[in-house]
A protein has these predicted regions:
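Class I S-adenosyl-L-methionine
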Residues: 108-133
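Short, glycine/charged-enriched secondary-structure capping and boundary segments
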Residues: 16, 38-40, 68-70, 95-98
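N-terminal, charge-rich interaction modules
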Residues: 1-38
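Short, glycine-rich nucleotide/cofactor-binding loops
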Residues: 54-63
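Mid-chain, well-packed structural core segment of small domains
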Residues: 64-95
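Short acidic low-complexity segments
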Residues: 40-50
Length: 133
């Protein structure tokens, strides 16, 4: 049986995680972990760069203070997932996908996917615009 609001795809597939990817979890909530991550995931490189960053935020103002540095760490071809509390799960937050775009678009990022990361978190996948790579 599948959970309402979910595609049935494994979390790692939704997030685009592959063996060998360098992954960083920013502002990870206590007790939160990737569900069934692929073998061979690694932490960020010595300079903090990563193929995929999953950053959790509860308030919009937190995004503005961190998105520039997070974007630098995925340059040129990585992905930044900005996660916020899912309203469909009864959580409250001032973050929406529109709010995230207001921070992301002016610095050269573009959104390419939205997904339910899990029961409690929604996510918007951001990448560098092709002309900025």
């Amino acid at each position: 049986m599948t959970t309402p609001g979910y595609s049935g795809r494994p979390q790692a597939a939704k997030l685009g995680l592959k063996p060998g990817h360098r992954v960083h979890l920013q502002n990870r909530p206590d007790g939160w972990a990737l569900a069934d991550p692929p073998a061979g995931l690694a932490g960020p490189g010595p300079d903090g760069t990563a193929d995929v960053i999953l950053a959790f935020f509860s308030r919009a103002e937190e995004i503005g203070g961190q998105i520039g540095e997070l974007a630098r760490r995925i340059y040129p071809a990585g992905a930044l997932w900005v996660a916020w509390p899912r309203r469909a799960a009864g959580h409250r937050s001032d973050i929406t996908d529109t709010v995230i775009r207001e921070y992301a678009l002016p610095i050269g990022l573009v959104d390419v996917k939205v997904a339910a990361i899990d029961h409690d978190w929604s996510g918007l996948r951001l990448v560098w615009r092709t002309e900025h790579r």
